[in-house]
Amino acid sequence: MSRWWNSNSQFASDIEKATSETLPAGSEEISLYLEISDQIRSKSVDPKFAMRILKSRIDHSNPNVQIMALKLTDTCVKNGGSGFLLEIASREFMDNLVSILRSPAGIDEDVKMVILRYIQSWALAVPDTNSPLSYIIHVYQNLKDGDYEFPEPSQNITSKFLDTETPPDWTDSEVCLRCRTPFTFTNRKHHCRNCGGVFCNQCSSKTLSLPHLGINQPVRVCDSCYSLRTKPKGSKSRARNERKFHAKTRKTPSKPVTNNEDEDIKRAIELSLKEMPQSREPPSYERPSEANVVISQDQHLTEDEDEELKRAIAISLEEAQKSSQKDDNVTAPNNMNISYPSVPAHTVSTDIRSSPFSGRPSDNPSTLISTADADNITLYATLVQKLKKLPPGSIFTEYQLQELHENMGVMRTRMMRSLGETMSKYNGLIQALQKLQTCMRLNDALIEQRLSSTYAHHYIDSSMDSNRSIEPEPDVISTVRNSSTIPQASSSSVPKIVVDSSPVTENPPSHSDVMGQKDTISSYYSTDTDVSANVMGNRHDEVVFSDTASGEKNTKLNIDESTNYYNTDSIDKVGEPFDEISSGYDDLMNGNDKQGNDIPEVQEASLIEL
């Protein structure tokens, strides 16, 4: 847009230079006049903008400037083309000339005569009153009826004065007008500046200047126009045939051809369209087969081809290859299951297909971008970038860019709506994810609580079992050597005593060995107190003996060592009456048995509570 404004500024400066106040009267620069008219005819400058610049110079207060501006306007009318003629024939320009003629402040006679002469010549050159230029005739008749005297025309004026060959309007087609190749994202459209037809790059790769159209710089032309403009003169009939061919082609651009080659191309296109839904590639880029077409076409690119377009195509192809590789890596089996670790009474197994949050393709077509939309976006961006390098005013000749601009507005609305829907879905998924995380945390806490209670209960049960298993039996140890037996009571409530008659095979541990143990019996037993029968029958006590016969007095023994040292029998092996155990018990406590032998002194021990 800045280039377009700069081009308009340059055009305004050229007009100001051609109608400068410093120029003497009658010293018009015809070459500059023709250059300005060529800019208008080549559509490098908007005709309306050119008309308003000339109108501002005609309204100048200097009569010399007004006359030169009128002469420049007449030159542009005869050489500027039909677009500029329509602007001159508008009410804006013609009414301004009438207002100058009828100015209350008066008007210079030379300026008045120049205005009347040009209005008369333009009106006489208009072929018909029904033409778009008929307002010039209407103004001419009103001035003629208003007692304005027009000068006699210096020559016979016909409509040929206004016939100017201008660049044709561009046509559109889905196939190349020369080779009938369909246009795609990579096979772009190109318009011939001479005939206005649309061709592919191979059929319009040549450039040529067109001075008869006011285009002095080399521009793109098709091969047919290039051969017509460069061949020797003398073949006018062939040139007319070529013009007729282009005219017929523009009228029927999509007319099918009947030869076998075109039919094969059509069948190939239909097959490719049928295979397109089965393709796994995203719709935003072309298939590899079209990439090969790009490579083959890039070999025929000429120096005038836009380098930025080449880079854009190369980048798009690289992105297409990367996207295809990512799709191959991401694709996974649809029947894949996810199983979580098992815990007691809790087993979780989910299926991706049954998950409400599993990734599924959207069925809403408004959220998808078709291949045509992606191509239009890329083409629009490419044309905008290319417009910066084109000559000033080329934006008015880029009709395709204007159409794409309108399409971008509609597409922007659709994409904004799709973006809103996508954001709503995203927010919903975020909320669902937060709820899922909360549920997972609660589930983990419940599992940990249940495991803790289970382990604690198991620990208590095992402790109780161990206490029962290690509780000492109320057995009384004896080392009577004469194998005398003391009768035991059958009741389980009274301690029962069994006397072991086996001889002692080894000496009890010494005092120094017992004191070296970690858990000694000295802290739990008292060797100075006698044990009564009643206390012995009511408490489960562990006892130690001092064997006077062995030579050691009151030796303190460890519990484990004493158990290993003496032979102990369970109380269940004895079933003697209670009266016999009472008498035997009294004798044992007094230190004598029935045979009169000495008995080791029995000392009371405190029960170790486990």
From Swiss-Prot:
Zn(2+) 1 binds at C176, C179, C200, C203. One of its GO terms (molecular function) is ubiquitin binding. GO terms for cellular component: cytosol; endosome membrane; ESCRT-0 complex; fungal-type vacuole membrane; nucleus; prospore membrane. Residues 229-264, 340-369, 482-517 are annotated as: Disordered. PROSITE patterns: UIM, VHS, ZF_FYVE. Residues 20-151 form the VHS domain. CDD domains: FYVE_spVPS27p_like, GAT_Vps27, VHS_Vps27. Its main location: membrane. InterPro entries: ENTH_VHS (IPR008942), HGS/VPS27 (IPR017073), UIM_dom (IPR003903), VHS_dom (IPR002014), Vps27_GAT-like (IPR049425), Znf_FYVE (IPR000306), Znf_FYVE-rel (IPR017455), Znf_FYVE_PHD (IPR011011). Zn(2+) 2 binds at C192, C195, C222, C225. It is a peripheral membrane protein. One of its GO terms (biological process) is late endosome to vacuole transport. A zinc finger (FYVE-type) spans 170-230. Residues 347-369, 482-494 have a biased composition (Polar residues). SUPFAM superfamilies: ENTH/VHS domain, FYVE/PHD zinc finger. Pfam families: FYVE (PF01363), UIM (PF02809), VHS (PF00790), Vps27_GAT-like (PF21356). It is found in: Endosome membrane; Cytoplasm. Residues 260-279, 304-323 form the UIM domain. Keywords: Cytoplasm, Endosome, Membrane, Metal-binding, Repeat, Zinc, Zinc-finger. The FYVE domain is involved in the binding to phosphatidylinositol 3-phosphate (PtdIns(3)P) which is required for the association to endosomal membranes. Both IUM domains are necessary for efficient binding to ubiquitin. Component of the ESCRT-0 complex which is the sorting receptor for ubiquitinated cargo proteins at the multivesicular body (MVB) and recruits ESCRT-I to the MVB outer membrane. Belongs to the VPS27 family. Component of the ESCRT-0 complex composed of hse1 and sst4. PANTHER family: VACUOLAR PROTEIN SORTING-ASSOCIATED PROTEIN 27. This is Vacuolar protein sorting-associated protein 27. It comes from Schizosaccharomyces pombe (strain 972 / ATCC 24843).
